Regions:
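Subunit-assembly interface segments of extracellular/virion macromolecular structures
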Residues: 1-193
Length: 193
């Protein structure tokens, strides 16, 4: 549709482990149970990089240190054509963490900088705090994680899936609740909840 220019490919948000001990009533969108941690963006716009690389989070380890509650994990940039049985690792960042004060903080190790065009000054502006060490991706860390105000024991556990349309259905006018979208209609279209 050509409404937008090239955009960098990005992963879904990588999310934390469930912080409650019960699976009853589990909802991935419940922020009291699961937190967004970070996601990756390709450095180049368009879909070329998206077809060449994939990202794996490996070596996830909870902290065993009483003085440092932050666990560690590794990030692997892999060839998109490889398999888990025979991985082809292009770049590897070992023992990174989510502690903004650490030298192994994921943003410091991989980098989070990107360019954006500023019409006022008519030039590109560098945004982000840490130069990119990766040749392929930059990381975007969720704001509360970057400020150090989230639970220090959080570790990457999964990711949100792609967006999808909300389900919907038809309801007869005689069955419609009082707050339906239209009144007096014999067929009312409303989202299913």
């Amino acid at each position: 549709d050509f409404k937008y220019g090239f955009q960098a490919a990005q992963t879904p948000w990588i999310i934390s482990q469930d912080r409650q001990n019960s699976s009853a009533g589990y909802d991935i969108l419940d922020t009291s149970r699961v937190s967004k941690l970070f996601k990756f963006h390709t450095l180049d716009a368009g879909d070329d990089e998206m077809k060449k690389i994939k990202i794996s989070i490996t070596d996830i380890k909870a902290s065993t240190n009483d003085f440092d509650p932050y666990g560690t994990f590794s990030v692997e940039i892999r060839d998109a054509r490889d398999s888990d049985n025979s991985p082809i690792v292009i770049e590897r960042y070992s023992s990174v963490n989510l502690n903004p004060n650490s030298t192994q903080y994921i943003s410091k190790v991989i980098g989070d900088q990107f360019l954006t065009w500023d019409d006022t000054v008519r030039r590109y502006i560098v945004k982000g705090n840490y130069p990119n060490a990766s040749n392929y991706v930059r990381v975007e860390v969720e704001r509360d994680v970057d400020r150090g105000v989230t639970d220090a024991t959080l570790l990457p556990f999964g990711s949100y899936g792609p967006l999808r349309f909300q389900q919907w259905g038809y309801q007869s006018g005689s069955d419609a609740p009082a707050n339906a979208w239209a009144r007096g209609s014999t067929n009312i279209c409303r989202p299913l909840i």
